C-alpha cells in the first residue's frame, strides 16, 4: 500500500473533529491508534465468522416494494419553485441545536441534557458546554458566521426506482435514480426504495442545501495563537449550526413553503426525535448512498449561486459545515438503509445513471461488500 499510517472509520461526521484531535494529540495518539487497531482486528474476525445475508434478485426485490397509500400523498406546495435564504438568524438556529452529537464529537458519550449530570463525564461535559455557549454568544453578537440556504419543490412522478422531475420552466426532465434494498426480509417487510414514496401518476419532491460560512479568519487566528481547542470548538459549533439550519428549514418547509403540516407545533426535543411528517434523506447516507446525486440536486437548486456551497470532484461540500438532501412529504415516508446490493442492481444502476460499471462500483463500493 502507498499509505501505512492509521485509518479510522468514522460513522458520523459529527465525530470527525474529536477523532482528528486525538490523532493530532502528542499524548493520546499512540494509545488511540493501538486501541482502534485492536478493535478492528476483532471486527474483521467477527465478520469472517458471520454468514453473509441472503440477497434477492433485483426483480424479486422490486416485486416486494413498499406499497404506500398514495391517496395520502402531500398536496402540491403552497410556494413551489426555489427559495433562497441569504442570512438566517443564528440566534434562532441556536434554539434548534442538537447537543448530543456535539458531545460525541468530543468523545463524550451520553444524551443531552443527562450527560451534564453524568457521574463519569458530567464535569467535563459541563465545562465544555459552558465554553461552547460562551463562544456561541460571541458568534451571534459579533456576527462571526453567516447561514445561507436554499429549498426547492418540483412536480415529479415515479418510474420504477427512478423519480422523474419535470422542470416546467425549462421544458426538461431530470431523473433521480434511487437504490432498492435487496437483502431478503422477514415476513411482511418490504424491500424499500425512496421512489416508493412517490406517486407514478404525479407528485411533488423537494430538495435543500444549507451551509455555514465565515469560519476562515477565526480559524486562522486560532492557528496563529496555537489555540487548538478554540479551533476544534468553532468547527464543531459550525457543524451544529448547519444541522440546526437543516432542521429549522425543514420545519419551515412543512408549515409554510410546502405547507402540508401547517398546524405543526413541536418542541426541539420532538424535532430531534423526528416526530413529524416527512423525511429529508441526504445523498451519501443509508437510504440514498450515492454521493454522485449531489450535482443533480445542486443544479436543481442552483445551490452554488444561492448558497455559496461548492462540491469537490468527489462530491464533498465546501464549506464543510453544510447539509443537503431531498424532501419527501408522504406520511409513510421513513428512513432506512439500502445496505448490500447485488451485481444485477449495480448493472441496472450503471445503466440508469449512464456510467460504466467501474464508475458505478466506485460510487457504491460500501454497498457491494
Model feature map: region roles:
Residues 7-11, 336-337:
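Alpha-helix capping and helix-loop boundary segments enriched in small/acidic/polar residues
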Residues 189-369:
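C-terminal accessory domains/tails appended to large, multi-domain proteins
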Amino acid at each position: 500500500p502507498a499509505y501505512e499510517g492509521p485509518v479510522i472509520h468514522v460513522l458520523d461526521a459529527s465525530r470527525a473533529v474529536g477523532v482528528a484531535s486525538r490523532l493530532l494529540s502528542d499524548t493520546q495518539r499512540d494509545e488511540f491508534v493501538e486501541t482502534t487497531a485492536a478493535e478492528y482486528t476483532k471486527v474483521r474476525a467477527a465478520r469472517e465468522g458471520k454468514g453473509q445475508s441472503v440477497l434477492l434478485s433485483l426483480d424479486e426485490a422490486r416485486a416486494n416494494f413498499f406499497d404506500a397509500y398514495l391517496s395520502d400523498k402531500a398536496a402540491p406546495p403552497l410556494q413551489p419553485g426555489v427559495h433562497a435564504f441569504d442570512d438566517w438568524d443564528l440566534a434562532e438556529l441556536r434554539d434548534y441545536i442538537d447537543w448530543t452529537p456535539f458531545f460525541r464529537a468530543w468523545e463524550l458519550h451520553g444524551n443531552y441534557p443527562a450527560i451534564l449530570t453524568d457521574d463519569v463525564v458530567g464535569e467535563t461535559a459541563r465545562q465544555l458546554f459552558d465554553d461552547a455557549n460562551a463562544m456561541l454568544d460571541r458568534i451571534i453578537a459579533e456576527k462571526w458566521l453567516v447561514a445561507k440556504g436554499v429549498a426547492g419543490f418540483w412536480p415529479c412522478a415515479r418510474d420504477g426506482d427512478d423519480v422523474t422531475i419535470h422542470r416546467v420552466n425549462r421544458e426538461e426532465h431530470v431523473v433521480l435514480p434511487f437504490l432498492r434494498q435487496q437483502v431478503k426480509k422477514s415476513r411482511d417487510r418490504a424491500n424499500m426504495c425512496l421512489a416508493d414514496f412517490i406517486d407514478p401518476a404525479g407528485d411533488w419532491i423537494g430538495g435543500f442545501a444549507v451551509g455555514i460560512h465565515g469560519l476562515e479568519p477565526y480559524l486562522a487566528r486560532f492557528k496563529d495563537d496555537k489555540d487548538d481547542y478554540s479551533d476544534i470548538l468553532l468547527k464543531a459549533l459550525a457543524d451544529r449550526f448547519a444541522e440546526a439550519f437543516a432542521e429549522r428549514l425543514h420545519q419551515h418547509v412543512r408549515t409554510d413553503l410546502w405547507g402540508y403540516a401547517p398546524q405543526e407545533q413541536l418542541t426541539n426535543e420532538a424535532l430531534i426525535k423526528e416526530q413529524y411528517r416527512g423525511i429529508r434523506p441526504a445523498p451519501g447516507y443509508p437510504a440514498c448512498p450515492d454521493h454522485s446525486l449531489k450535482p443533480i440536486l445542486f443544479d436543481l437548486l442552483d445551490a452554488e449561486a444561492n448558497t455559496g456551497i461548492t462540491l469537490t470532484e468527489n462530491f464533498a461540500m465546501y464549506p464543510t459545515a453544510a447539509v443537503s438532501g431531498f424532501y419527501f412529504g408522504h406520511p409513510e415516508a421513513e428512513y432506512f438503509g439500502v445496505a448490500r446490493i447485488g451485481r444485477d442492481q449495480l448493472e441496472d444502476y450503471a445503466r440508469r445513471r449512464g456510467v460504466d460499471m467501474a464508475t458505478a462500483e466506485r460510487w457504491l463500493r460500501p454497498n457491494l461488500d
